[in-house]
Amino acid sequence: MHSHHSHSGDYSAHGTDPLDSVVDQVVNLNFHTYCLTEHIPRIEAKFIYPEEQSLGKNPEEVITKLETSFKNFMSHAQEIKTRYADRPDVRTKFIIGMEIESCDMAHIEYAKRLMKENNDILKFCVGSVHHVNGIPIDFDQQQWYNSLHSFNDNLKHFLLSYFQSQYEMLINIKPLVVGHFDLYKLFLPNDMLVNQKSGNCNEETGVPVASLDVISEWPEIYDAVVRNLQFIDSYGGAIEINTSALRKRLEEPYPSKTLCNLVKKHCGSRFVLSDDAHGVAQVGVCYDKVKKYIVDVLQLEYICYLEESQSPENLLTVKRLPISQFVNDPFWANI
């Protein structure tokens, strides 16, 4: 079993447990591959989260501490990887990466620099979008609304901006794993009224957004998604199926069935699995539910995972695991 995206309380302000405790749980559950991928630091004051304000007396001090924390993560993760590399009683292989912050071009360039300067440790990145129009969309409901308000409460324009930001991240970074592809749905209210033609919200002519498939409702959105997936396919990237959406009470993981069908059509059906854990209790979270999603709903023939070569360069390759082997993995006996 695999997870390609994880965090801990040591290096994330919204994490809950030490990295070593998370790793202990990973080993106890008998994962095959587990990727350690803390967030890169945000390097501008306006992107510091409220929970991080207490890290320093001023924004500059907070940013310095975030940068130091990320350096500490790389050292710690390398020690963990080495610790378990030659243990015959542990089958888990740890791969070290990072989750990028694509708030703006400055952060995209910073991510590229981090990867280049630390390529002996960081083997890949999870490419994610957490901000739309510079406003976080996964922090809380009010911030999500603030982002929507910045588009004059037009959901279509909001989504177009999300997928354009994703595209800019993709063409500049070419992340091997693309994270929570439809994160925008986390705080999207099911009962919000949307005009099907214009995308304007809360109009009397609107219908509940839950009754719409927002990807196929507007051709501009559909085309942007297909463009992004075709670009990911062009360099061999993979889309993560992320169970944190199920943990947060959404009906489907990231991405939705509609998007997954487009991945099958335009991106070689390259899916990897992630728990996006931020603590011990979230390791392998909702994997029983996602197994049904993968096998019964998506009817995938295989699931992909990353494997690190034993060459001097330690390059990563995307491997395929047939679904028949996936459903019979020893991991399932432990959850």
Swiss-Prot record:
Superkingdom per UniProt: Eukaryota
Pathway(s) of this molecule: Amino-acid biosynthesis; L-histidine biosynthesis; L-histidine from 5-phospho-alpha-D-ribose 1-diphosphate: step 8/9
Recorded GO CC terms: cytoplasm
Pfam families hit by this protein: PHP
GO biological process, one term: L-histidine biosynthetic process
EC numbers: 3.1.3.15
The entry's keywords: Amino-acid biosynthesis, Histidine biosynthesis, Hydrolase
Reaction(s) this enzyme catalyzes, per UniProt: L-histidinol phosphate + H2O = L-histidinol + phosphate
The UniProt record lists the keyword Amino-acid biosynthesis: yes
Enzyme class, UniProt record, top EC level: hydrolase
Coiled-coil blocks: none
Family: Belongs to the PHP hydrolase family. HisK subfamily.
Miscellaneous comment as given in the Swiss-Prot or TrEMBL entry: Present with 4280 molecules/cell in log phase SD medium.
Name of this protein: Histidinol-phosphatase
